[in-house]
Amino acid sequence: MPGKEAAGDVMKSSTKSNTKKMVQARLPFKRLNPVPKDEGCLEEKKIRIPQNVSPQKMLYSLNSSMEDMENDCEMETEMTPIPKAINGKGPLDNYIRKAPKASNAPSIITIDLTEDSNISTSNDSPLNGESRAQLANGTVSPERSTTNAPLSTNEECTVSVDNKSLENMSFPELELDKPHQSAASCTSVSNFSPERAVKEDYNSSADDDSVSVSSSSSPVSLSSPDVQTGSKFTNGSSPSTSTTPTGKATSNKTSAEKKKTKDKAEKRQAEKEERECARREARAAKDLAKKKREGEREQREKDKKEKKEREDREKAEKNRLKEEKKKEKLEALEAKQEEKRKKEEEKRQKEEEKRLKEEEKRIKAEKAEITRFLQKPKTPQAPKTFARSCGKFAPFEIKKGMALAPLCRIDFEQEASEELDIFLQEQTSESSFLDEIKKRRPRKMGQTTVPTINSVEVDDVQVLGETDPVLGSNMVLEEHIKDIGVPERKKFGRMKLLQFCENHRPAYWGTSNKRSRVINPRKPWAQDTDMLDYEVDSDEEWEEEEPGESLSHSEGENEDDDPKEEEDEDDDGFFVPHGYLSNDEGVSDEECTDPENQKVRQKLKAKEWDDLQSNSKKIRVLQPVVIGCVWCDSKASEIRLLQKFSACILESPAVEEELTQDISSAQKIKDRQILSKLVPLLHGNVNGSKIIIQEFQECCRRGLFLEDNASHATDIESTSPNSTPQTPSNIIVPSKARLKRLISENSVYEKRPEHRMCWYVHSDVLKGLQQDNLPVPCQWTYITQVNSVSKENNGANGGSLQSLPLSGKRKSAGSMPITKFMKRARDLETAVNTDMDGFQADTEEEEDDDDCMIIEDQQAKDAEDSTIECKINLNDSAILASCQN
């Protein structure tokens, strides 16, 4: 290849000398003697064009280099002004024309020792005058230059042309089959100026000529005009050189070498073309393979993408089908469970119905067994009475409680009919019926009642035989006894509810036959002081029951039991025959003390029950025997019967208001005295109000609060708590209602930071009573047997904790007898005596102590020992007094 040769023969011409000289071999692309350049000179721009490039591409590269050269020229012209053209010629044209002609001196041939054969210029390919002129003018045709002077690949020509001529140059397409056409050419065009050309002309010499070394691509460089002129003289033929025999021999030799070199160049060019063709084919095959691989890769990616999409669709379809199957399975399972649940529900309902039927049968059997002893005797049915046929009505049965109405509702007597006849005869036509209507005085006529005939039978007559010592005769009272049942509601009136929001006691639900003349629907808030006493607070008389034992531990034990069975068991307990009970069941605490009396009572009750069952006596509601009304012209027998029930009215003066005020002030003073004695026991006490009231009443009965009986109180405290001394006659024990009212008004049961839950008396009450320094908890010494347990179920710190006896303890719910829930009439002695737990019930005089006064009048005991007690009710308008001798 021409570009890879180490060096070549370079033909260099100079204006000063044309002698040949030997130059040293040099490496490619290395300048041995670089030409020094001025700092102001611009570097030459070399354009390398490969040999296989077409002329169109080479022209494009040349045009681009020309554009760069024009830009450089513009930059240079900006710095130095360009001289103006004279007669259409610039300084370059003048410079080329004024170039020196070739001298007659023998030309110097430069021989490169690195080449096999030296290539020199000969006369066979000289540049004639016409070509020189065209080269000088810049109009050298490439075709002509190549035909006249073919160049080898190792040759380098330096041509200097101006920019204008290069722009106007045209490079036609070269044919590769011509042997004299070069493989490729490159021109390096550099911008120059006249000043630069002059400097290079003066600085050029024979030893230091500018040498252009051919590269691997064998470029053609266009250098300065001095090199161009030198090449002209070198390539040109002179008369002296053409006539010498040495030049002929050299030209023959060089032509042979040139031909040989040309053959080699053609061979290399052919090989190069083959290699280029093979390279192009390989590149085309490579591009085709690359395109094929890219197509295959794109196809694979496309197939992979489609496969992935197809798999995703199949997977989504599978998931959808799976979800649908799962949903269907769930629906089927739910339907199956629903069906199973319905079957179980139906089965459970059937079992429940069956169990209820069996339960009803069992209950009926038990009731039949229980009521077998209490069956009523069947009474013979009365003969049915039928009414006779009258008019349109057929005969019908007259049942009990029915009466047949007469044909005429009014039964006329003979006297009434005679009076009617007289009125009919004496009537006149003067008075009109219309006049009576105009008077607007309608006459009233009451309801006609059907006369009832009381049929008195022997069984329905109640005979009361009694010998009255006053009348001295037996009196028989007959009354028709009504059917056994609930009293008629018409007789007692409606049930009424009396309830107020301020009251703590339960409301009243019952009948009330009293009617007020003051209170009516127009005045519902009026006060009837004659019938009601508005000063009496009924809440004070009401005693709330203490909270019972907690049954939370027993809750849920009998939840599985049938409630109907429990009712049956309770019913069975009521029908247990007498004598069947155990010794300690159904007996009160008082009866436990005497077992003999207990046995006697049980025997009497069993006998009474047997007699009642044997005689089949009916238990019915008692009805009073009403006698009256008694009029002045009544019979003497009725008056004599009712005479012993007559009431005597005592005349007494009216109650003065001052007396009422004195009583209220006296009550306040008494309440203050009681409170002063109650505060030491109440303040700081952890027990309940019932225990405190019981302890205070016991202290009052023993007279511990009397100031003049201190020694007596000391003796009583030293005695045993079980002993119950007699209450002095001059001591009044306050009632439970009064004590509870005082406790609730003057204290509060709460928890404070300094102590736990206990009673705290108000600070103003303590200051008023001058008892501010009372300890908390209280240091009271109890005289009764109490279990000091607070509402928190904690033991009291101040009180002495004493245990109750076994008889006073509360019995468990399982061993409670039935008679505990039944009312029992107490004798007067049991009401006065103390119970087993040490609590004495309040008497009637003690409860009504606020509203009553006890007047004692002790007369001379020697003459007559009698005491008169008068109980006066101050709240009623009438004063009733009862005296006892």
From Swiss-Prot:
Keyword DNA damage carried by entry: yes
Residue stretches of biased makeup (Polar residues): 116-128, 134-157, 182-193
One CC-aspect GO term: nucleus
Subcellular location: Nucleus
Region span, Necessary for homodimerization, competence for chromatin assembly: 629-665
Region (Disordered): 1-24, 115-157, 176-361, 536-605
Coiled coil location: 251-376
InterPro entries attached to this UniProt entry: CAF-1_p150_acidic, CAF1-p150_C2, CAF1_p150_N, CAF1A_DD
Biased segments, Low complexity type: 12-21, 211-227, 237-254
GO biological process, one term: nucleosome assembly
Subunit structure: Homodimer.
Protein family according to the UniProt entry: Belongs to the CHAF1A family.
Protein name: Chromatin assembly factor 1 subunit A-B
Name of encoding gene: chaf1a-b
